[in-house]
Structure formats: structure tokens, C-alpha cells
Regions:
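Active-site environment of divalent metal-dependent phosphoester hydrolases
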Residues: 2-5, 25-29, 97-99, 133-135, ...
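Structured beta-strand-rich core segments of catalytic domains in phosphoester-bond hydrolases
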Residues: 22-96
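N-terminal, active-site-proximal structural segment of metallo-dependent hydrolase catalytic domains
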Residues: 1-35, 230-233
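Conserved beta strand-loop-helix elements of the APE1-like EEP
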Residues: 47-63, 81, 179-201, 226-229
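Metal-dependent phosphoesterases centered on the DNase I-like endonuclease/exonuclease/phosphatase
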Residues: 17, 107-189
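Active-site metal-binding loops of divalent metal-dependent hydrolases
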Residues: 1, 23, 94, 130, ...
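Surface polyanion/phosphate-binding segment centered on an Asp-His-Pro turn
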Residues: 215-233
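Surface-exposed cleft-lining segments at the edges of enzyme active sites
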Residues: 90-108, 134-139
């Protein structure tokens, strides 16, 4: 379902920032008069019906980093400013069928090497649809899910879900995808990785349920709440 058709339901969560994979171009976003308007939008994609949208419903503003590499389709490195703290946000929809090396997690693997200098142990978040899980690691593939997790951990950047609930990678108990909306096909493929300063201020992580969200999407929202110090820039 298009974002414009489910925005009212999503916005009941009162997000500061929304990451929406498979999102229509902003020109197509026609909301009802009572629907809150975003204060800033950043969108990329080659298909006007399915791109990657980043929305602010707060004081945060987005700016693409100078060394953005468009070869990593739908991985957006953004400077986020104007809110409680400035930080670097990697909005992710890992899906590039043109890359013969691998269209899903391999995209993230390549991107975190290219943007290595931006992956700091503070003020860094990577979030979105990684289309991956440790259970799908392949023996002869370098860019598996587990090496991605390992490289980020070496930078002191960790999965908020796994930190909050204490599960290991591959042992998640809250699916973020029910493939084809079938309840018997649950997978955890959406993540929010955050640097230690965010992890230290992690307040809550919640995954939407099958019953609440299936009418809107095969994916379930991953909502992450940080309790940040005021005006920490």
C-alpha cells in the first residue's frame, strides 16, 4: 500500500523521523487536510512509485553528504541537523537487482566500506530494510549479514533491537516481515543500528504486530525511541 494511503495510521506513532522503503515520489503524496505534513523530505529512486523516502515530523532537516555514491542504490547517507542532536543517518532499502555481486545485503556491505570514514562510534544511525538475516549467510559470499554486523560492531555501532531485547542475530522473536502477508512466513529483516551514544540513551524498541499492520503492508514497523539530552550538538 502506498505511503499516502497509510500515513494517518503510521503517524499515530508520532515519529520524529520516518524511513519508508518502497515509497512513492513526493509529487504523488496527496494527504487529507487533517494529516500532518512533513517538515522535510528526502527521496531517491528511479521508479516514481517505489523509492526510498525519509520524512521529518520534527525540527530535523536532511542534507545528502558530499561523497554520496549513487552506485549504492537506495542507501542514503544524510546529515541530519536542527533537532536535539546532529548526526549522520544512513537510510537503507537494500535492493539493487542490477548488481551481479548481490542485490540485497551485499549493497550494505559495499556501502559501509565506501563510507567507512562516516561510520563513527557517535552520532551515527543506519536504519531501514536490509533484506537480510544471519540465517541466510552463504559460505562463499563475502558480503553476508554476519560480516556486516561484525564490521559495524568493530565501529561500536550496534543493532538497537538486539541490544534492547538481548537476542542474538538470527534468533529474533519479533518478525518485521511476513512474506506475501502469510503469517507462517515470518522473518526479521529490518534493522536500526546505532552508535554507542545513542545506545546509551535507548529507551524503547517496538515491532508492529501481524494483526495490527498486515492490512497496510507485509512489513511491520520498527519503532526506536531514544531519550536524548536536550540540545546536544
Amino acid at each position: 500500500m502506498a505511503f499516502r494511503k497509510k500515513a494517518d495510521y503510521i503517524l499515530l506513532q508520532k515519529p520524529d523521523i520516518l524511513i519508508i522503503p518502497e515509497c512513492e515520489h513526493p509529487d504523488k503524496l496527496k494527504f487529507d487536510k487533517d494529516t500532518p505534513e512533513p517538515t522535510d523530505i528526502f527521496w531517491c529512486g528511479t521508479n516514481r512509485n517505489k523509492g526510498l523516502g525519509v520524512f521529518s515530523y520534527s525540527n530535523y532537516k536532511f542534507e545528502l553528504v558530499d561523497n554520496h555514491n549513487p552506485d549504492f542504490k537506495s542507501i542514503l547517507p544524510l546529515h541530519v541537523t536542527g533537532g536535539q542532536t546532529d548526526f549522520t543517518l544512513f537510510a537503507i532499502w537494500a535492493n539493487n537487482p542490477q548488481d551481479k555481486d548481490g542485490q540485497y545485503i551485499t549493497q550494505v556491505w559495499k556501502a559501509i566500506h565506501y563510507y567507512d570514514n562516516l561510520l563513527l562510534d557517535n552520532k551515527t544511525i543506519l536504519i531501514g530494510d536490509f533484506n537480510s538475516n544471519t540465517i541466510w549467510d552463504k559460505k562463499y559470499r563475502e558480503g553476508n549479514h554476519s560480516p556486516v554486523v561484525g564490521k559495524l560492531a568493530a565501529k561500536k555501532i550496534f543493532s538497537t533491537y538486539h541490544k534492547f531485547y538481548g537476542y542474538s542475530q538470527g534468533a529474533e522473536q519479533h518478525p518485521t516481515l511476513f512474506m506475501y502477508r502469510h503469517q507462517n512466513k515470518p522473518y526479521h529483516i529490518d534493522y536500526c543500528f546505532a552508535s554507542t551514544d545513542f545506545i546509551e540513551n535507548l529507551k524503547n524498541v517496538e515491532v508492529g504486530t501481524y494483526n495490527d499492520w498486515t492490512q497496510y503492508s507485509d512489513h511491520k514497523p520498527l519503532a526506536v525511541t531514544f531519550e536524548l539530552p536536550q540540545n546536544k550538538n
